[in-house]
Amino acid sequence: MNIGVNFFGPKRSLYHDFDGTLERLKQSGLTSAEICVAFAGNGEPPKELNLQIPEEIIRQMSGGIWPLEVASERLAAVRTHGLTVLSCHMMLGFQTTPEQLIGMLPTLLEFGTANQIAYYVFSPMKDLNGIKALIPAIKKVSDGLAEAGITLLLHNHEMECIPVDGVTALDYVLEQCPNLGLELDVGWAKFAGADPVALMQKYHDRIPLLHFKDVRADACAANRDTCFTAIGEGSIPLRGIMAAAKDCAIVEHGLIIDQDDSPTDILEDLARGAENIRAAAQ
């Protein structure tokens, strides 16, 4: 079973020892990577999350979130280490406007075609009211990428899974944008109080990539940035998720661990998480 990793999680390790970290990931049985590229914005977190990130940590984040000007070179290095790369997480500014999103399309097309990117992933981090203004831009970008054979995927956080007047941003945007796929993050869905298995069943034909994240049973807004566990050691229904994955349109190398952080050693967590995913699939 091929299992990958999103580079946001091991960002500090990649910052301190890029090549050594890639080798450790391979030795852990991970076979692919989802890169994160800063296409726009200053990288500052939204104020409503109330995160306090020291400057040194922001510098270390560059290990996993690459500036566009060095992304192609680093991507080539990742592939040289034998890791498959199909997808790129677009790291946008949290206040990205519809006009700015549309304006990125030529750059996305250029980078994607030059680097054999099959999927772009973006995280709006908006509820229903916030997502509505972005719909025309999402349509235009997803349609433009589709013409080049690249699929745009929505990656959810908890905001997209919390209903507003009975409707979630996730449901609304997928209904409005037929060329948009879904990279469901099961951990953020669980954090929001949603049922990740039910979401997988509902959108089974629109999920080519699946993000594994696990959170403690007491995960809440107060501990949002420290609630992560190795996959299979928190509160997500991992066996149910793996059973539902069989009926989804998940591609080879489409199972991706996206553990944001670790209270101990992120690389050890990733290794255990991969083992737990494989065990849950049996």
Regions found by a protein language model. Give the residues of each.
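N-terminal pre-domain/capping segments
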Residues: 1-114, 282
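Hydrophobic faces of well-ordered beta-strands that scaffold small-molecule active sites
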Residues: 3-6, 33-35, 85-90, 120-122, ...
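Active-site beta-loop-alpha junctions enriched in small/polar residues
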Residues: 6-10, 36-40, 90-93, 124-127, ...
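A structural motif
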Residues: 30, 83, 114-117, 179, ...
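Acidic/histidine-rich catalytic cores of soluble enzymes
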Residues: 33, 143-235
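Active-site acidic/histidine proton-transfer and metal-coordination neighborhood
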Residues: 81, 90-181, 267-268
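A short, acidic, flexible beta-alpha connecting loop/helix-capping segment that sits on the rim
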Residues: 256-266
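C-terminal helical cap(s) of enzyme catalytic domains, especially alpha/beta-barrels
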Residues: 266-282
